[in-house]
């Protein structure tokens, strides 16, 4: 099962994965019928934060701050009395990234006083060091805000979730609990006793960083849209996660839908009741001309893990202009742009959703565009964020699908415009070309 494998296991045949798992037989994009049974087993509100484990939180956080336009909002480190780990919170709109690195265990080896305890109660020196050694820079926790973290944990475990950290109440205000998601990644539940606490602070033990001491960066990124995992076998992972959360299947793609002549994947998306918490999961396809990019990830990551984070922008053109300015000076690089023919055919594919000037800007910035029967998706992918060809970031903007809630307030439905099914082949080609450059250099070496 994906969440249990520390090492990479080869599928004998890609049909052995999701197709053989009870309740999850992939039928492909064209035959899949989207339904929302509103089957969550506990009340889910939204994504709360993403925690990265790293070797040095200060420098990694600074790079993400500069590259994504996220401001330093809170800290828990030696200066706040935390002798266990350094943690720095970056925010942009509702998006929260937390970067955590261990201090020497000897600092807190004796009697730990309240002023020296870890702000993240589940933090463990050995686990963090082992994680970083095995995976390099990566996501440790996908945190979702729930109505009651203790209840969510109990229900999850009762429905097959593997416990990672039992519920802990912080300052009689916030409850945190964790279960295993896949690989060494955990699904973290966060709940607040009172709404005013939720709005006033991130977590107890963190001190706010005043605006005056944080350079006011903002490139237009507003929230986390979806968090994607890679596993050796899709079926068991889907059965496991859907089994303890109750999340329903929102979309699916098979190698026939999204592969190239050289490689492919199978993928399915799990969603919460309001479809604002989206968890796609991928598996590699074997027996193709080239090794699947998912298999490459699994080998370099030493097992299952989080592949990429899709960040929602309110203006993708502004976001990309700002990010590309910084690509060569400490920011993030992007995958190669598609050929000119892609943009010549774009008007035919997306209709009047984008003006001619906007299509021209998409070409200049390398933005991919796709649409489904409900809305339009604009997207672009970075190259891997660190030394290994593993985790990367997707910047997206969704257009359309506007709804009204019971109070008449407008909102955009989750997953509007789909997941770029029409762009998968372009993305695969660019990743294949990127991997070929690495292989060529390895052969020369």
From Swiss-Prot:
It is an enzyme of class 1 (oxidoreductase). Residues 1-11 have a biased composition (Polar residues). It catalyses: 3-(4-hydroxyphenyl)pyruvate + O2 = homogentisate + CO2. It is found in: Cytoplasm. Its EC number is 1.13.11.27. Its main location: cytoplasm. GO terms for molecular function: 4-hydroxyphenylpyruvate dioxygenase activity; identical protein binding; iron ion binding. Keywords: Cytoplasm, Dioxygenase, Iron, Metal-binding, Oxidoreductase, Phenylalanine catabolism, Repeat, Tyrosine catabolism. Belongs to the 4HPPD family. One of its GO terms (cellular component) is cytoplasm. Residues 46-192, 223-383 form the VOC domain. Homodimer. The keyword Oxidoreductase applies. This is 4-hydroxyphenylpyruvate dioxygenase. It comes from the Eukaryota. Gene3D superfamilies: 2,3-Dihydroxybiphenyl 1,2-Dioxygenase, domain 1 (3.10.180.10). Binds 1 Fe cation per subunit. GO terms for biological process: L-phenylalanine catabolic process; tyrosine catabolic process.
